[in-house]
C-alpha cells in the first residue's frame, strides 16, 4: 500500500508544481482568445496529418509541408501561443523525466521484450 500512497503523494506534488501551474495559466490565457485556439488547432491538425503520412510510409505532400511550415511561422510570432507551447513542453519534460526515473528503477521490467527486439 505504501507504493500507492507515494504515487498519490507524487500526484499531489505534480498538481502543485510550477510547471503545471504555468501550463494552466498559459492554457487559460490561450483559451481566452478563440482566434489563438483556432490557429493552434489548425497547426496541430496539419502536424498530425503530416506525421500520419510519414508513419504510414507515404511521402508527405510538399504543399502540406509548406503549409505546416507557414502555420508554424505564424504561431511562433504569437506570444500567447508560444508561451502555451513552452509551458506544455516543460510539463511534458517533467512527466517524461519522472517516467524515466520509474522505468529505470525496474530494469528487469520489459527486458524480455527488449532482448527479443535486439535479436532481430
Swiss-Prot record:
**Matching Gene3D superfamilies:** YheA/YmcA-like (1.20.1500.10)
Give the family per the record: Belongs to the UPF0342 family.
Question: What is the protein named?
Answer: UPF0342 protein Moth_0821
Top-level taxon: Bacteria
Amino acid at each position: 500500500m505504501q507504493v500507492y500512497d507515494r504515487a498519490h503523494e507524487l500526484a499531489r506534488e505534480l498538481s502543485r508544481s510550477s510547471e503545471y501551474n504555468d501550463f494552466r495559466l498559459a492554457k487559460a490565457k490561450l483559451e481566452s482568445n478563440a482566434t489563438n485556439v483556432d490557429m493552434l488547432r489548425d497547426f496541430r491538425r496539419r502536424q498530425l496529418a503530416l506525421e500520419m503520412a510519414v508513419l504510414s510510409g507515404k511521402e508527405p505532400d510538399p504543399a502540406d509541408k509548406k503549409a505546416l511550415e507557414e502555420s508554424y511561422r505564424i504561431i511562433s510570432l504569437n506570444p500567447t501561443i508560444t508561451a502555451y507551447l513552452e509551458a506544455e513542453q516543460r510539463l511534458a519534460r517533467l512527466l517524461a523525466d519522472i517516467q524515466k526515473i520509474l522505468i529505470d528503477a525496474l530494469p528487469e521490467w520489459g527486458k524480455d521484450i527488449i532482448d527479443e527486439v535486439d535479436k532481430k
